[in-house]
Amino acid sequence: MSTTIIGRLTTDPEIKFINNGMALVNFSVAVNRKKGEEEYVSYFDVTAWGTLAQGVADSLHKGDRVIVNGFLTQDRYENKEGKTVGKVILNAQAVGPDLQFATAEVHSAKKKEVEPAF
């Protein structure tokens, strides 16, 4: 199931490269919503991979308003106290600036050339 959130980056995206050279970027998005006079904030941890990760790291910064679409997964890990805890992560399939609040200059990503198999 696809999920879309709209909010602001709470930190600059952190890019890393895993063993096979694949790019990975992690960032957090704060989503504000109002119910009557009350305002609520929800925070979402987001992960993007590959060329999307590189584009996010090169283009977006803390405070930017973004639209993120992806799927939710649950990560389980052992905390410092030795307890297994769960964390929900939005694995991004698409990320972009919210053009209602910003302008963007789009540059197509360069595609890798594939050599013929013969």
Can you say where each PLM-predicted feature lies in the sequence?
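A short hydrophobic beta-strand segment most commonly corresponding to one strand
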Residues: 87-95
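Acidic, gly/ser/pro-rich intrinsically disordered tails
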Residues: 1, 14-20, 36-39, 54, ...
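Short, basic/aromatic beta-hairpin or loop at an interaction surface
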Residues: 38-46
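Beta-rich strand-turn-strand
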Residues: 49-85, 98-101
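A short glycine-rich, His/Asp/Glu-containing loop-to-beta-strand
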Residues: 2-4, 23-31, 42
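OB-fold and OB-like beta-barrel modules that bind single-stranded nucleic acids
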Residues: 4-11, 29, 62-73, 92
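Short aromatic-glycine-enriched beta-strand elements
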Residues: 17-30, 86-88
